[in-house]
Design a protein with these regions (language model features):
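P-loop NTP-binding module
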Residues: 2-177
Length: 177
C-alpha cells in the first residue's frame, strides 16, 4: 500500500498539466525518467505525483524508485508492507513480479528501491534493468523512473538509455536568469 498526498487544487492541476504535456509530446513516450541537478530539488515528489496523475487518469502506471543510494520513496510505503525492492531484482534474488508493490490506488503500482547496494551504477546498467523495463512496457501504460540527481552520480544517464524521455526538475527559486 502507498500513502497518497493531500495536494491543493492548484498543485494537482499543475501535475495534470505536466501529464498532459507528456501525453501530447509523442505517441511512444511510455517510459520517462525524472532527475534533478542536485539533491533536494523535489524530483522524487514530482515522480510520485506525476505517476499518481497518470494512474488517476486511468492509465496503468508503474513508478520505479531507482534512487537506490538515498531513496525517499520508502516513506511512501506503509510500514511492514514492503518486502522486496529494485536491488533485490537487479541482483537476481527476486523476479519482477516479487518486487512490484500493487497499491490500493487503482492503476498505481510501485517498485521501491530496496537495500542500498555496494555498486548502484553497475546494477542499473546491467541487462536485468533493461529486461525489467521491457517486461514492464508490456504490462503498463506508463512507467515513471525516479533517478538520482544527474549532477551527483552517473545513474540517471545510464538509465536514460532505456527510456523514451526525461524530465529535469529544478528547485523553485534555485535558478536566476
Amino acid at each position: 500500500s502507498v500513502k497518497q498526498s493531500n495536494l491543493d487544487f492548484r498543485t494537482r492541476e499543475a501535475y495534470k498539466m505536466l501529464r498532459t504535456n507528456i501525453e501530447f509530446s509523442g505517441d511512444n513516450n511510455k517510459v520517462i525518467f525524472i532527475t534533478s541537478s542536485t539533491p533536494s530539488e523535489g524530483k522524487s515528489t514530482v515522480s510520485f505525483e506525476l505517476a499518481m496523475s497518470f494512474a488517476q487518469n486511468g492509465m496503468k502506471t508503474l513508478l520505479i524508485d531507482a534512487d537506490t543510494r538515498k531513496s525517499v520513496m520508502k516513506n511512501r510505503g506503509k510500514k511492514g508492507k514492503i518486502k522486496y525492492g529494485l536491488t533485490h531484482y537487479l541482483s537476481g534474488k527476486n523476479e519482477l513480479k516479487d518486487v512490484i508493490c500493487v497499491s490500493d490506488v487503482p492503476n498505481f503500482c510501485m517498485i521501491f528501491a530496496g537495500p542500498v547496494p555496494p555498486n548502484p551504477s553497475e546494477l542499473v546498467g546491467n541487462d536485468r534493468f533493461a529486461k525489467m523495463v521491457e517486461e514492464a512496457r508490456a504490462t503498463f501504460d506508463m512507467i515513471i523512473i525516479d533517478t538520482p540527481p544527474i549532477g551527483s552520480v552517473i545513474d540517471a544517464a545510464v538509465i536514460s538509455k532505456v527510456c523514451d524521455g526525461g524530465i529535469l526538475v529544478i528547485g523553485a527559486g534555485d535558478i536566476s536568469y
